[in-house]
Amino acid sequence: MAKSSVLSTFAAAAITLQLLLSSASASPHMKYIDAICDRAHDQAFCVKTLTSNPPTAAPIGLLPLAEAVINLATSHAEKTAIFVDENAKKDPAVKAAFTECHKAYMAVAAALKSANMKLKASPDTANYDVRASSDHMRRVNELVGKNSDKTSTTLKEMTVQMEKLLDLAAGAADAVDDDDENIRLRV
């Protein structure tokens, strides 16, 4: 008797979980998140990021979600620029490289702000602005990629995160455009 009670409880829990998962993926919000995450290189990261951040978790439309995604990337670029600037002042050994990294992150933040302003009127241009930021990330990797100090390691981790967020931002701009001419850039 106890064994069948445990089994029926387990079955009920499994059915409830299945219903919750299917209703979450069928929610109107998920179609906007899917429109962006389908364009991302790391779709699991995309879904996790967009569903766990309040500004992106329950979008009211594709354009507001895309703007929120680009804002998320902008915020990370600005925070990383502050981190780099503060550490350039503290450690003379990394000052020259970090000064250049600071410039790169400031350029990324500016490009993302520009992309967000252009998103509605010209999503192709916004997509270009976001994708051009990848050049700055390559520069940061060139400057600190071989460094093994703790601060450089932290910056490398922040740069990996920035690259992932840039991918989401590019996917967001592309989703707003939705003409799939940029699909070749995602392959």
Residue positions per predicted region:
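Terminal membrane/secretory targeting segments in land-plant proteins
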Residues: M1-P28, V187
